[in-house]
Amino acid sequence: MDIGDMRRDFESEGLDREHLNEDPVQQFQTWFEDARTAGILEPNAMSLATTGADGMPDLRTVLLKYFDSQGFVFYTNYGSRKAQELQENPRAALLFPWIGLNRQVRIQGAVEKVSKAESLRYFSSRPRGSQIGAWVSEQSQVITSRGLLEQKVAEMKRKFSSGEIPLPSFWGGYRVVPERIEFWQGRPSRLHDRFEYVREGDGWTIQRLQP
């Protein structure tokens, strides 16, 4: 199917160097709040790219759950495919596609596990059904039917029928520690504005990139 004629021009205000915060995480927070205020559906949804030992790129959508100057945090099963790839190659890229604002943010960096205390704090805040789900799913493993999954849910509900549900030892968070962050603003005629922050020691350099 030829879809080459699917296009639209971007009618966005420009992004200039003087409008940028010197700290890319502060700049990200500004844009994140813009996306949330604009009603972007799940503005914390991000594409997570990883590569394992075989060199084959992998990609999936996950949810950002916390960010600060130390990095960007998401949670998953430590037995999942993404976790295996991060063990083999602890580097990743993130993409926030805020299409409704003609914006996107790309982040590249090293990846580390968060502390057990951080994982427990977030796990304890999750709805009970999601906590059960974390115990049930052997993420990325083959299962022969949906019925088996629902059977495991029923078993876990009986097991944890009262009291708090403990944090699984195989579940927790990762932090992407940024080394590069790019802010992209769509402009007319595909002459977009792109600014890249590159970590230099304890600070950042900012440079404009050609579209």
From Swiss-Prot:
Give any single GO term for biological process: pyridoxine biosynthetic process
Reaction catalysis annotation: pyridoxamine 5'-phosphate + O2 + H2O = pyridoxal 5'-phosphate + H2O2 + NH4(+); pyridoxine 5'-phosphate + O2 = pyridoxal 5'-phosphate + H2O2
* UniProt pathway: Cofactor metabolism; pyridoxal 5'-phosphate salvage; pyridoxal 5'-phosphate from pyridoxamine 5'-phosphate: step 1/1; Cofactor metabolism; pyridoxal 5'-phosphate salvage; pyridoxal 5'-phosphate from pyridoxine 5'-phosphate: step 1/1
Instruction: Tell me the keywords, alphabetical order.
Output: Flavoprotein, FMN, Oxidoreductase, Pyridoxine biosynthesis
InterPro entries for the chain: Pyridox_Oxase (IPR000659), Pyridox_Oxase_CS (IPR019740), Pyridox_Oxase_N (IPR011576), Pyridoxamine_oxidase_dimer_C (IPR019576), Split_barrel_FMN-bd (IPR012349)
GO MF annotation list:
FMN binding; pyridoxamine phosphate oxidase activity
- Residue numbers binding FMN: 60-65, 75-76, 81-82, 104, 139-140, 184, 194
The cofactor remark states: Binds 1 FMN per subunit.
Q: Which cofactor does it need?
A: FMN
List of residues binding substrate: K65, Y122, R126, S130, R190, L191, H192
Q: What is its EC number?
A: 1.4.3.5
SUPFAM superfamilies given for it?
A: FMN-binding split barrel
In terms of PANTHER family, this protein maps to:
PYRIDOXINE-5'-PHOSPHATE OXIDASE, PYRIDOXINE-5-PHOSPHATE OXIDASE
Q: What does this protein do?
A: Catalyzes the oxidation of either pyridoxine 5'-phosphate (PNP) or pyridoxamine 5'-phosphate (PMP) into pyridoxal 5'-phosphate (PLP).
Quaternary structure annotation from Swiss-Prot or TrEMBL: Homodimer.
**Family, as annotated:** Belongs to the pyridoxamine 5'-phosphate oxidase family.
Q: What is this protein called?
A: Pyridoxine/pyridoxamine 5'-phosphate oxidase
Organism for this UniProt entry: Marinobacter nauticus (strain ATCC 700491 / DSM 11845 / VT8)
